Regions:
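N-terminal low-complexity, acidic/Ser/Thr/Gly/Pro-rich segments
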Residues: 1-174
Length: 174
């Protein structure tokens, strides 16, 4: 083979399908502490050695014509008549609860770090991520990306005047 990939972490997924329907009306995906570590085999002339860490990946979707679900308050799983109680949050993995609010469409936070080196060939990089022949690229970066729907007070009077606005946010630290 040319490369090897190691994957670890937690993933939880759920969907809600109305009785009589065949397609899901609501779906959610959450990932946490996911680590992806690829490495190219020696002698290939191409090197890929690093770790992509996904601290969190949240995705909340609804079918056309429906608002996204508030997963933290949508269920009465223990049948006690209280919706969104302590025992009413979906937690299929036991480690990662599905509890996104309806305002969140997606969120991603993570980092990438090179863990190879070219010091054996006289180089000075100790955090090589990618190599191709004599070219080496190294370093690390952290990132976040999110999209949510919120109400916005655009004039500072304490009242929302832009309702249901989409807010996209991105951060990158190198």
């Amino acid at each position: 083979g040319v490369a090897k990939v190691t994957l670890t972490g937690a993933v939880s997924v759920a969907r809600v399908t109305a009785a009589g329907d065949s397609a899901a009306r609501y779906s959610v995906l959450e990932m946490g502490a996911v680590s992806v570590t690829p490495s190219a085999t020696s002698g290939s002339g191409f090197g890929l050695s690093g770790t992509l860490t996904i601290a969190k990946l949240d995705y909340n979707a609804a079918a056309a014509g429906y608002a996204r679900l508030n997963w933290a308050k949508a269920f009465d799983l223990d049948g006690n008549g209280v919706w969104g109680g302590a025992n009413d949050v979906l937690n299929p993995s036991g480690a990662l609860a599905l509890n996104l609010p309806g305002s969140v469409q997606f969120g991603l936070a993570g980092s990438i770090t090179g863990n190879g080196n070219n010091t054996g060939s006289g180089g000075t990089l100790a955090d090589v991520l990618l190599s191709a022949g004599p070219v080496y690229v190294g370093g690390s970066a952290a990132f976040t990306l999110s999209r949510q729907t919120v109400d916005v007070d655009t004039n500072g009077d304490g009242k929302a005047d832009l309702l249901g606005a989409r807010v996209d946010a991105l951060s990158l630290t190198i």
